[in-house]
């Protein structure tokens, strides 16, 4: 067992004090001190459950077979992780309350129980409550263990007894170590419990999933160090009033950080959405103004999404701008370009923009679709339902090239689109599917003239 010493650290500058201070003497910040625990390692502190101490090995002698990924029955979940669950990995999943984090992990756990032993430790629900929720997810394998406990030492004891292949902690803010002062969810408790879980996962090849709460700003609650300690950080996103959920990787040591998985919450649990483009566009109205379609890339997957805009004359002194699912600063930049380079008088217009379906669009390739949607609403002229738009807009009004242009265009062709406006200088040497017309453009003014003339 490690020797622990409590100290107080300023979260602004890192100044340390043996006692709590209301104001930091180094940076003058108020109420910035939190209790931390200094851990001094003692001999033989970090060993596996079998009592084996870790030793240095040559890189060429490391057995790759021990890191064979375990596949779940959900291809969307496997994609986000980089191809499956890696033994010994520490995976942190965050999301808003009620978004479905526990449902997702319970569903994944039931599938992993067919391929190994699963220990599901919950500090938020009793075993009876979890059993009630699991009944709608299908049959449960015998190798699925439930444990309602908040004491980390007790959880460690059961890990030593059961020796699971997969461990689920729901949630990290409810687990506490009796060796550390402080309430559940405090900075010192979260950090120490995570460190112990990391040691257990790495020394015993236990794939560990940790549920983390988020703050009102949408970031993971607890110390920032929590995200640095784990191997993978996933965010489970979605509007509470929509059935669609998006699992997004923001850190992944074993795969890409650009992949997303899309699910739909149904009465029987989460169901994969294998063709998200069709889902996001199925409710689009033909002939509606203020609508444009873009082919966005989420990792290696092209997805067609709809950008909607509503431009109305302002009745107040200052025009109002509102965005949902789009970057506010990017929208403001595009509106400034439209006003300066294309002659659209938008300074006295309110503008409300959103991405339909709750998907977040934040890559430069959406610029042209945003500009067309704004112009469509302003001019009261609809776009063709078979047209899509690709391209980044520069401050001089030029259309810049985007990545994976060929893959984007072919995806639009698969879904029945007949025309795509794309950067002209990005179309050389690409293989385009039959039945789709690709219009190379150089300026945003050229696009607006072609679409609305």
Swiss-Prot record:
Region (Lon-protease-like): 350-453
GO biological process, one term: recombinational repair
Keywords on record: ATP-binding, DNA damage, DNA repair, DNA-binding, Hydrolase, Metal-binding, Nucleotide-binding, Stress response, Zinc, Zinc-finger
CDD domains: RadA_SMS_N
Record SUPFAM superfamilies: P-loop containing nucleoside triphosphate hydrolases, Ribosomal protein S5 domain 2-like
Major enzyme class: hydrolase
ZnF (C4-type) intervals: 10-27
GO molecular function, one term: ATP binding
GO cellular component: cytosol
Superkingdom field: Bacteria
Gene3D superfamilies: 3.30.230.10, P-loop containing nucleotide triphosphate hydrolases (3.40.50.300)
Amino acids binding ATP: 95-102
EC number, UniProt record: 3.6.4.-
Chain ranges for the short sequence motif RadA KNRFG motif as given in the UniProt record: 251-255
UniProt-listed InterPro entries: AAA+_ATPase, DNA_repair_RadA, P-loop_NTPase, RecA_ATP-bd, Ribosomal_Su5_D2-typ_SF, Ribsml_uS5_D2-typ_fold_subgr, Rubredoxin_2
UniProt function note: DNA-dependent ATPase involved in processing of recombination intermediates, plays a role in repairing DNA breaks. Stimulates the branch migration of RecA-mediated strand transfer reactions, allowing the 3' invading strand to extend heteroduplex DNA faster. Binds ssDNA in the presence of ADP but not other nucleotides, has ATPase activity that is stimulated by ssDNA and various branched DNA structures, but inhibited by SSB. Does not have RecA's homology-searching function.
Entry remark concerning the domains of this protein: Has a putative N-terminal zinc-finger, a middle region with homology to RecA with ATPase motifs including the RadA KNRFG motif, while the C-terminus is homologous to Lon protease.
Alphabetized NCBIfam families for the sequence: sms (TIGR00416)
Family membership noted in the UniProt record: Belongs to the RecA family. RadA subfamily.
Protein name as it appears in the record: DNA repair protein RadA
Record lineage: Bacteria, Bacillati, Bacillota, Bacilli, Lactobacillales
């Amino acid at each position: 067992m490690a020797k622990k010493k409590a100290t107080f650290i300023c979260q602004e500058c890192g100044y340390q004090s043996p006692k709590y201070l209301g104001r930091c003497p180094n940076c003058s910040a108020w109420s910035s001190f939190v209790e931390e625990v200094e851990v001094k390692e003692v001999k033989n502190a970090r060993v596996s459950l079998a009592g084996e101490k870790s030793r240095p090995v040559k890189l060429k002698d490391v057995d790759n077979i021990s890191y064979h990924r375990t596949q779940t029955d959900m291809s969307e979940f496997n994609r986000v992780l980089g191809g499956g669950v890696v033994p010994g990995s520490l995976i942190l999943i965050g999301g808003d309350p009620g978004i479905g984090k526990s449902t997702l992990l319970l569903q994944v756990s039931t599938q992993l129980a067919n391929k190994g032993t699963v220990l599901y430790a919950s500090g938020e629900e009793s075993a009876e409550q979890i059993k009630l929720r699991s009944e709608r997810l299908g049959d449960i394998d015998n190798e699925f263990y439930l444990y309602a406990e908040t004491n980390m030492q007790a959880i460690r004891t059961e890990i030593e007894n059961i020796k699971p292949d997969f461990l689920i902690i729901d949630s990290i803010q409810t687990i506490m170590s009796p060796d550390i002062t402080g309430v559940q969810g405090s900075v010192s408790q979260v950090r120490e419990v995570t460190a112990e879980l990391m040691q257990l996962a790495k020394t015993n090849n236990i794939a560990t999933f940790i549920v983390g709460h988020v703050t009102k700003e949408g970031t993971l609650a607890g110390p920032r160090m929590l995200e640095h300690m784990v191997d993978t950080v996933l965010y489970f996103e979605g509007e509470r009033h929509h059935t669609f959920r998006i699992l997004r990787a923001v850190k992944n040591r074993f795969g890409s950080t650009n992949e997303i998985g899309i699910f739909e919450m149904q009465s029987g649990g989460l169901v994969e959405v294998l063709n998200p483009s069709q889902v996001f566009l199925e409710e689009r109205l033909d002939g509606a103004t203020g609508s444009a379609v873009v082919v966005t890339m989420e990792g290696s997957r092209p997805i067609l999404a709809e950008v909607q805009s509503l431009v109305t004359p302002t009745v107040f002194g200052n025009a109002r701008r509102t965005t949902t699912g789009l970057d506010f600063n990017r929208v403001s930049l595009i509106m400034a370009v439209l006003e300066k380079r294309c002659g659209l008088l938008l300074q006295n217009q309110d503008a409300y923009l959103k991405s339909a379906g709750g998907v977040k669009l934040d890559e430069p390739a959406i610029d042209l679709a945003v500009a067309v949607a704004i112009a469509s609403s302003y001019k009261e002229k609809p776009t063709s339902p078979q047209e899509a738009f690709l391209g980044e807009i520069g401050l001089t009004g030029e259309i810049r090239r985007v990545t994976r242009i060929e893959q984007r265009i072919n995806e639009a062709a698969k879904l029945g689109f007949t025309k795509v406006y794309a950067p002209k200088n990005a179309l050389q040497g690409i293989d385009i599917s039959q039945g789709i017309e690709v219009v190379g453009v150089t300026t945003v003014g050229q696009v607006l003239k072609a679409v609305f003339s």
